[in-house]
Swiss-Prot record:
SUPFAM superfamilies: UDP-Glycosyltransferase/glycogen phosphorylase (SSF53756). This is UDP-N-acetylglucosamine--N-acetylmuramyl-(pentapeptide) pyrophosphoryl-undecaprenol N-acetylglucosamine transferase. The lineage of its organism: Bacteria, Pseudomonadati, Campylobacterota, Epsilonproteobacteria, Campylobacterales. Keywords: Cell cycle, Cell division, Cell inner membrane, Cell membrane, Cell shape, Cell wall biogenesis/degradation, Glycosyltransferase, Membrane, Peptidoglycan synthesis, Transferase. It catalyses: di-trans,octa-cis-undecaprenyl diphospho-N-acetyl-alpha-D-muramoyl-L-alanyl-D-glutamyl-meso-2,6-diaminopimeloyl-D-alanyl-D-alanine + UDP-N-acetyl-alpha-D-glucosamine = di-trans,octa-cis-undecaprenyl diphospho-[N-acetyl-alpha-D-glucosaminyl-(1->4)]-N-acetyl-alpha-D-muramoyl-L-alanyl-D-glutamyl-meso-2,6-diaminopimeloyl-D-alanyl-D-alanine + UDP + H(+). It comes from the Bacteria. GO terms for molecular function: UDP-N-acetyl-D-glucosamine:N-acetylmuramoyl-L-alanyl-D-glutamyl-meso-2,6-diaminopimelyl-D-alanyl-D-alanine-diphosphoundecaprenol 4-beta-N-acetylglucosaminlytransferase activity; undecaprenyldiphospho-muramoylpentapeptide beta-N-acetylglucosaminyltransferase activity.
Length: 342
């Protein structure tokens, strides 16, 4: 069997693609990847040899575009979907699995036009525009936040490095795969207070702020573990006892898999405020704290860090997500729906 995996744009979407690829390989399913020249798709998968083939199309997002530009983008997407139909024929694609994001649009529409099964995984608590549009036409729609809960695909390595946290010795700041300027500034402002408490700093700052953050820590004579981006984030997480993080869904569930307690600062401009609702999923179970970016008081925030019951939260996070989530999705999509697959 050969399937197409499509979608991306951000690290969160692409992490799911990688999990699905690894699961498909275990089941002897070949995968073709269809993404975009824009976003992070090429950086993640251009050199990924496990795909049968990879295509990076000229697809673009439509968020914040004018009405004319949106119409133009839609017409361009329909043109690209024709190219995808040719890809499907050439590689004998039997099903399409979308993880969302604008780069999923051409292949997803092509699946419908080609009468191929379309399986969609929505990573966030609030569905993106493309997934909302396609949901009624999908063969199966998966979400960890829906009433019919589906497992969230998280790489095994995050589970393998899990441990129960009991004492705050190391704190990790996570701004997402591209970094976050606000969280970087927060980390730098908290650094002297953390040093006074002998709390070590691990800091993912993104490429744009790397030199600035590095120099600031040096000026404070603080030996922080600072990095722009890491494909082995689980190695950084396992050394941490608390995370200060944005609330992208992949990051949130990776933290849960690692049983790493977190304070979330949702990105305030995320579509439909989905990062807030992602974090609220845990807050409603008393498994995290949420601070809104525009109302953070540094002293109050620091007090909250010190008050957290790390052991209680870390222990209960073990029940939030489960290992082999991607395996379960592949099973539910492809093997439980064989009547739809030619």
């Amino acid at each position: 069997m050969t399937i197409a995996l499509t979608g991306g744009g951000t690290g969160g979407h692409l992490a799911i693609v990688r999990c699905l690829l690894e699961s498909a390989i275990k089941k002897n399913i070949e995968c073709v990847y269809i993404g975009s020249q824009n976003g992070q798709d090429k950086a993640w998968f251009e050199n990924e040899v496990r795909f049968k083939e990879k295509f990076f199309l000229s697809s673009k997002g439509v968020v914040n575009q004018s009405k004319f530009d949106k119409i133009s983008s839609l017409l361009h997407t329909l043109k690209l979907s024709k190219d995808c139909r040719e890809i499907f024929k050439k590689y004998h694609i039997q099903a399409v699995f979308s993880v969302g994001g604008y780069s999923a649009a051409p292949a997803s529409f092509a699946a419908l036009f080609s009468h191929l099964p379309l399986f969609i995984h929505e990573q966030n608590s609030k569905s993106g525009s493309l997934n909302m549009l396609l949901k009624p036409f999908a063969t199966k729609f998966f979400s960890a936040f829906e009433k019919e809960i589906s497992p969230y695909p998280v790489a095994d390595k995050f589970f393998d490095n899990a441990r129960i946290r009991k004492e705050l010795k190391n704190i990790i700041f996570l701004g997402g795969s591209q970094g976050a300027q606000f969280i970087n500034e927060l980390a730098l402002n908290l650094a002297p207070k953390l040093q006074e408490q002998n709390i070590k700093i691990i800091h993912q700052c993104g490429k744009n702020d790397f030199e600035k953050c590095k120099k600031h820590y040096q000026s404070l004579n603080i030996q922080a573990d600072i990095f722009d981006f890491s494909l082995n984030l689980e190695e950084k997480m396992k050394n941490a006892d608390l995370a200060i993080s944005r609330a992208g869904a992949s990051t949130l569930f990776e933290l849960c898999a690692n049983t790493l307690p977190a304070i979330f600062i949702p990105y305030p401009y995320a579509a439909k405020n989905h990062q807030y609702f992602n974090a609220k999923f845990l807050q409603d179970q008393a498994l995290c704290q949420i601070f809104m970016q525009n109302s953070i008081n540094l002293d109050e925030f620091f007090k909250s860090i010190l008050k957290l019951n790390l052991e209680n939260i870390s222990t209960r996070l073990q029940n939030i997500t489960q290992k082999n989530g991607a395996d379960m999705l592949i099973q539910k999509a492809l093997f439980d729906n064989l009547t739809f697959i030619r």
